[in-house]
């Protein structure tokens, strides 16, 4: 299952990327948290139909 990861850098720039599976999502989020350069990180599931699920916030400063 695919996931979309949304994030905001500390300077306010917002961006997003897609991950192929939960393992890739978790590794990317873990790396982002360890870097300490973000003020917002969230993810949501992308279903096979193309619909997005509920957004889950990981970091919100």
Show which residues each predicted segment covers.
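Low-complexity, intrinsically disordered short segments enriched for Gly/Pro and polybasic residues
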Residues: 1, 21-22, 46-47
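Short aromatic-glycine-(Arg/Gly/Cys) micro-motifs in beta-strand/loop hairpins
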Residues: 1-13
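Short, surface-exposed linear segments at secondary-structure transitions and domain or protein termini
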Residues: 23-33
């Amino acid at each position: 299952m695919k996931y979309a990861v949304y994030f905001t850098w500390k300077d306010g720039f917002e961006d997003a990327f897609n991950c192929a599976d939960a393992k890739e999502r978790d590794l990317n989020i873990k790396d982002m948290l360890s870097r300490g350069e973000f003020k917002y990180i969230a993810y949501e599931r992308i279903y096979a139909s193309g619909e997005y699920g509920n957004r889950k916030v990981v970091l919100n400063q």
